[in-house]
Regions:
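Metallo-beta-lactamase
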Residues: 37-56, 60-72, 89-151, 196, ...
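Active-site flanking residues adjacent to catalytic metal/cofactor-binding acidic residues
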Residues: 13, 67, 87-88, 173-176, ...
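Cap/insert and terminal regions of metallo-dependent hydrolase folds
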Residues: 19, 34-49, 168-260
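Pre-active-site segment of Zn-dependent metallo-hydrolases
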Residues: 9-63
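Catalytic core of the metallo-beta-lactamase
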Residues: 1-25, 56-59, 79-82, 122-185
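Short, conserved loop/helix-junction motifs that constitute active-site signature segments
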Residues: 78-81, 113-115
């Protein structure tokens, strides 16, 4: 998860598992993924608990930007009932209908994780002024202009990254567009076989996923020092990026929260 402190309140990017996954994992996570991933569901690692430890209240989270609605990214949505949820319309549509692959579609998407949420802002898959050569959605409703949605279809039909202008350069959260730093940050592609297989199992469009991964790789090489890229599931990237300090320019302050 990513927590952004802005003049418009706290903005949470993805939510990880929430308190209800901790309390009722059998109802909230498909047995297949509980067995495969063996998630360690600890109350203290939920986004709401980490935010409270930072001295904030849950109601301080005014907005949630969701990359996609997979079970491990959307579980905490209902811990923040007053927040507005920002997501592509395509992702909301396919998640509600549980269309995310012949085998995993009904398992990856758990509508009970968001069916109580009332405040949604839905966006097209791009169409705004490009960002670094990528389609982008700018002017997210109620959010600072420094925060953009960047569509990255392939892992899911409506999957997006999130770009944040910190005032000292860009952060680019690529979510599940890749899983391991060696996929984008090395001269030669490198990814552990297990993660490679997991990505293939979860993808809905291999051509789009690999094309977007290559574009992220190109961005990493071309914009070194200007854009810091990270994904949702690489622990080493988390270690390097956690605890980014507030910019002296007044741009949004960004912190990483560890996924439960």
């Amino acid at each position: 998860c990513l927590l952004i402190e802005s003049d418009r309140g706290l903005i949470l990017v993805d939510t990880g598992f929430g308190t209800r996954e901790v309390a009722m994992p059998g109802r909230r996570i498909a047995p297949f993924f509980r067995a495969l991933n063996n998630p360690q569901l600890r109350p203290e690692e939920t986004a709401i608990a980490q935010i409270q430890r930072l001295g904030f209240k849950p109601a301080d989270v005014r907005h949630i930007v969701i990359s996609h609605l997979d079970f491990d990214h959307a579980g905490g949505i209902e811990d923040f009932p007053h927040a507005t949820i920002h997501i592509t319309a395509r992702e909301k549509e396919v998640a509600d209908e549980r269309r995310g692959g012949a085998f995993v579609g009904t398992r990856r998407y758990r509508p009970q994780q968001w069916d109580e949420a009332e405040n949604w802002s839905l966006y097209p898959m791009g169409g705004g002024e490009p960002w670094m050569g990528f389609d982008a959605v700018r002017d997210l409703q109620g959010l600072s202009p420094e925060i953009l949605l960047v569509p990255l279809a392939g892992h899911t039909w409506g999957h997006s990254g999130v770009a944040i202008d910190t005032g000292r350069g860009w952060l680019f959260y690529a979510a599940d567009a890749y899983f391991y730093r060696g996929e984008i940050g090395a001269e030669r592609y490198d990814c552990p076989p297990g993660l490679r297989g997991y990505q293939r199992m979860m993808e809905v469009d291999r051509t789009a996923r690999l094309a977007n991964q290559q574009r992220i790789r190109d961005l990493a090489l071309q914009q070194q020092g200007e854009v810091r890229i990270f994904c949702a599931h690489d622990a080493r990237e988390f270690e390097l990026l956690s605890g980014i300090e507030k910019s002296s320019t007044g741009a949004p302050s960004v912190r990483e929260l560890e996924f439960a």
